[in-house]
């Protein structure tokens, strides 16, 4: 009993506010609305993107499919796509806004009018995670956005609205760069504006949600599962062996014994090594017992399969083979891949492409006001049920009937001329 009194147990609760970060809360602080409980919801989405391999692959696959082989325009106006700003073409802009659209659910462009205000001179991409919306007007319109790449560092807010990181006092937004919402009618007094695409989402008034929002917790599970296995490999001894010594060692001696054991036997580099122990008498021999896994290997295998399927479903990828993931027990998947690709192209990629193409076409109409009757589309290879491919062009949602076919005909004509005159 006396010895038992020397043993104390403590319960340690770990909390990193992960549950709060999943919630895309919109709450007013000072003159703008924070994006997430701690004003870091976009940074949370970036964290998921960078740390979940399957989620990262899904996003990249969608973005690459959306961008396709790039923007195309009718032959007379092709040169308009070459310059969005001094450093980038419209294809460069397309790649960035396609990623933002998929990752955050929206995208933003800085629009700069010419000195004489007759046309848009330059258009730049703005990382959507940098935006925080100003409070809506009485008419329900967002007048503009504050812009910073340090929201999670300097302007992180607590649940109640108070500043979480005490870098600044209340009213920090006053010194932040601000851009009014894109409005050609105000181009004279507002030469720099911001165009923000923020589609309607139930419950969201200021910020969008990505289409995979329902799987945010599942993506976290994927990351934590990888972290669990990584730590298991690094700390090799902890989950597999119980070692009991009978030396009545003091704390310093116990720490030294633990250090020697970890140094000699833990980690992946020591897997399969021989354990040799020399003691002065049998009474002092340590007791080494394996800790049964209780089926944890099978549990985590099933968990991994469940997580993978849920993430794929959230991204509307019906077949894992589209990402190069082989399904166990499947003999052949050619037909499945073709069917899945056709569904993916028409229900996932095409809607993205139509929205982005329409945006580019609208911006070009302000950048080149004298250009009329031009068509813009995204070129891609379309896969058919028999496995054959054909050039396909997706135009904007406001495009007239036949514009896509006209662009396809021009592309085919150009390809034929290049073959005949290499």
Residue ranges, per PLM feature:
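Long, highly charged low-complexity segments enriched in Glu/Asp and Lys/Arg with interspersed Ser/Thr
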Residues: 362-399
């Amino acid at each position: 009993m006396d010895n038992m009194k020397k043993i104390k147990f403590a319960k340690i609760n770990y909390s990193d506010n992960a549950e709060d970060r999943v919630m895309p809360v919109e709450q007013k602080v000072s003159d703008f609305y924070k994006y997430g409980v701690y004003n870091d919801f976009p940074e949370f989405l970036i964290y998921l993107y960078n740390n979940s391999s399957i989620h990262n692959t899904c996003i990249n696959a969608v973005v690459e499919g959306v961008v396709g082989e790039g923007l195309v325009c009718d032959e007379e106006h092709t040169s308009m796509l070459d310059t969005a700003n001094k450093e980038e073409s419209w294809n460069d802009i397309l790649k960035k806004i396609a990623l933002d659209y998929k990752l955050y659910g929206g995208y933003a462009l800085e629009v700069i009018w010419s000195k004489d205000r007759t046309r848009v001179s330059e258009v730049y991409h703005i990382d959507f995670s940098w935006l925080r919306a100003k409070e809506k007007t009485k008419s329900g319109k967002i007048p503009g956005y504050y812009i910073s790449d340090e929201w999670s560092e300097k302007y992180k807010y607590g649940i109640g609205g108070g500043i979480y990181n005490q870098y600044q006092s209340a009213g920090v937004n006053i010194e932040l760069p601000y851009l009014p919402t894109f409005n050609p009618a105000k181009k004279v007094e507002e030469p720099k504006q911001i165009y923000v695409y923020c589609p309607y989402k139930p419950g969201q008034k200021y910020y969008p949600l990505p289409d995979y929002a329902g799987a945010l917790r599942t993506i976290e599970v994927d990351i934590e599962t990888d972290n669990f296995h990584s730590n298991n490999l690094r700390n090799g001894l902890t989950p597999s062996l119980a070692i009991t010594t009978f030396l009545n060692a003091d704390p310093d001696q116990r720490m030294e014994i633990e250090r020697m054991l970890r140094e000699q036997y833990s980690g992946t580099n020591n897997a399969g090594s021989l354990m040799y122990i020399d003691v002065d008498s049998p009474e002092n021999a340590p007791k080494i017992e394996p800790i049964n896994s209780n089926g944890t290997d099978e549990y985590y295998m099933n968990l991994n399969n469940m997580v993978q399927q849920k993430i794929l479903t959230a991204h509307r990828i019906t077949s894992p083979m589209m990402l190069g993931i082989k399904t166990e027990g499947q003999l052949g998947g050619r037909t499945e891949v073709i069917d899945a690709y056709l569904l993916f192209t028409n229900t996932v990629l095409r809607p993205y492409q139509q929205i982005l193409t329409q945006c580019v076409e609208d911006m070009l109409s302000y950048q080149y006001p004298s250009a009329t009757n031009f068509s813009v589309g995204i070129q891609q290879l379309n896969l058919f049920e028999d496995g054959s491919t054909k050039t396909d062009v997706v135009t904007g949602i406001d495009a007239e009937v036949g514009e896509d076919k006209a662009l396809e005909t021009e592309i085919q004509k150009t390809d034929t001329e290049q073959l005949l005159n290499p």
